[in-house]
């Protein structure tokens, strides 16, 4: 009996072992640190370094999960800071933030938007933002629409560029760095009129379909339903 027939027999007799889905959580929102309000519900950036969106996504490796900290410019979709770590400590988030801050013009006032995870609410992280003239914005609940651009960038990286599983974090780190370079300098976006992030990053003014304010539209639609 071949493999396919064998598995078909197991399936018919309900003897296949159901694959267990392992959920990996990257947001630790139960903490005592201050939670900041959402400042970007109806905000549309018109140039780079006006709004950054931050998020964490897990990267599977054979040894253990690694965690990719990302900071993306919402105007250009360019990833301006990233760090791959084998933990979700505040210090790992700060590594990504420092890379982004190194690119920020000294006189720019940036809104840094994230979820309410401990990595972003911690005193060390928020102090660093305030020291560099950054305003702090956070999601108000678990709705992914409140950080839609960050979620979209995660999806692009993981479905188009990043491997399904790496041998270890070191291998992952080297490959992901190359993937982000490809994303920034070669990957075209329909939301940027098919331009690349690196090119848009040097522009100013509205972009064609450049940033849909998903949360604002969703909130407005919900309000209309309630009032009708």
Question: Where do the PLM segments sit?
Answer:
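RNase H-like two-metal-ion nuclease catalytic core shared by retroviral integrases
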Residues: 26-29, 114-116, 122-123, 136-158, ...
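Basic, flexible linker segments flanking DNA-binding modules
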Residues: 1-48, 198-205
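Histidine-centered active-site/metal-ligand motif
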Residues: 31, 83, 112-113, 189
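Short small-residue beta-strand/loop micro-motif enriched in glycine and branched aliphatics
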Residues: 78-82, 136-139, 163-164
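C-terminal domain-tail junction helix/linker
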Residues: 130-134, 156-228
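An active-site-proximal beta-strand-loop segment
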Residues: 45-80, 86-88
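Active-site beta-loop-alpha junctions of metal-dependent nucleic acid enzymes
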Residues: 64, 82-106, 121
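Mobile genetic element proteins and their domesticated derivatives, centered on retroelements
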Residues: 6, 10, 40, 55, ...
């Amino acid at each position: 009996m071949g493999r396919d027939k064998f598995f078909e027999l197991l399936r018919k007799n309900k003897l296949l072992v159901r694959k267990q889905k392992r959920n990996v959580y990257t947001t630790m929102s139960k903490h005592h640190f201050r939670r900041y309000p959402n400042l970007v519900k109806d905000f549309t950036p018109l140039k780079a370094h006006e709004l950054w969106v931050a998020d964490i996504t897990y990267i599977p490796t054979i040894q253990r999960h690694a965690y990719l900290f990302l900071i993306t410019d919402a105007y250009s979709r360019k990833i301006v800071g990233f760090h791959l770590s084998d933990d979700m400590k505040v210090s790992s988030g700060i590594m990504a933030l420092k890379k982004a801050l190194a690119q920020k013009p000294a006189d720019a006032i940036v809104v840094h938007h994230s979820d309410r995870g401990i990595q972003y609410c911690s005193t060390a992280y928020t102090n660093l933002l305030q020291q560099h003239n950054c305003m702090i914005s956070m999601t108000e609940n678990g709705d992914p629409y409140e950080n839609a651009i960050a979620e979209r960038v995660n999806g692009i990286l993981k479905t188009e560029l990043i491997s399904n599983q790496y041998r270890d974090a070191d291998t992952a780190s080297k490959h992901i760095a190359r993937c982000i370079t490809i994303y920034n300098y070669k990957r075209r976006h329909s939301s940027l009129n098919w331009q690349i992030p690196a090119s848009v990053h040097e522009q100013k003014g509205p972009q064609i379909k450049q940033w849909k304010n998903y949360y604002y539209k969703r909130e407005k639609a919900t309000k209309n339903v309630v009032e009708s």
